[in-house]
């Protein structure tokens, strides 16, 4: 049994599609609309959400490529500067906070997660979360809402560490914070690149959790079978009630 088991957040512990879309695509445009409602930017700026989205997507691609993360607030501020919009950082922070907190009621636990965590904890595993979240308080509050926060010794985010999940260093850091070598840890997540491949490059075992949403969808224009073929996990689970036995089998 591994000493430490790490978990991705979205699509592994919980579902919150609106939050993910905000974090990776729509945040600056949504912030502009919030600021427009308060009269802090003009109507033309508030209506420029498509330009803001395109700039933000470009920024997110650079984060993926470099492995260097910027927070939700920093990323939004960067996009607004590129658009020539001057807004105090404090106003951006407040708008991001409101938008993120408004999505907390939409968070739902993946079926069986609570029982899987309990079994792993009872088996002596130390548990942690590794999330690519750009706004760390959301993950903490979501875990509290679901009654899961007490299971985890560490909640590690890309924004909190400055490391995106394309950098294997975030997984080595997480293992170290929980008192384990990478070889003594496993990571469970749904993304074949940022969860599976990156964790394995860090020296951890990688368990690919494949939720129903992945199995029934086309992913980035590829068929599911083609998408799955690009992963090389140590184990695969499709239901959380399988997880503790799979972790035990990793040695």
Task: Locate predicted features.
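A generic alpha-helix surface/boundary motif
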Residues: 29-30, 73-78, 137, 169
């Amino acid at each position: 049994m591994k000493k430490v088991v790490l978990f991705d957040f979205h699509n592994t512990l919980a579902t919150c599609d609106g939050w993910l879309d905000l974090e990776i695509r729509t945040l600056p445009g949504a912030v502009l609309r919030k600021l427009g409602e308060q009269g802090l930017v003009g109507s033309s700026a508030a209506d420029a959400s498509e330009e803001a989205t395109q700039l933000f997507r470009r920024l997110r691609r650079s984060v993926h490529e470099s492995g260097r993360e910027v927070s939700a607030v920093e990323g939004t501020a960067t996009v607004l500067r590129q658009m020539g919009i001057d807004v105090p950082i404090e106003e951006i922070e407040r708008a991001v906070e409101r938008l993120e907190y408004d999505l907390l009621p939409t968070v739902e636990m993946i079926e069986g997660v609570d029982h899987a965590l309990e079994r792993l904890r009872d088996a002596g595993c130390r548990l942690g979360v590794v999330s690519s979240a750009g706004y760390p308080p959301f993950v903490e509050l979501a875990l509290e809402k679901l009654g899961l926060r007490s299971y985890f010794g560490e909640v590690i985010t890309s924004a909190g560490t400055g490391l995106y999940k394309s950098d294997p260093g975030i997984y080595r850091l997480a293992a170290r914070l929980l008192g384990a070598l990478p070889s003594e840890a496993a990571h469970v997540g749904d993304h074949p690149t940022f969860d599976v491949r990156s964790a394995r490059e860090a020296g951890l075992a990688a368990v690919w959790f494949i939720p129903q949403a992945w199995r029934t969808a086309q992913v980035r224009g590829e068929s599911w079978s083609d998408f799955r073929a690009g992963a090389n996990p140590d184990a695969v689970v499709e239901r959380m009630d399988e997880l503790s036995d799979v972790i035990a089998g990793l040695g």
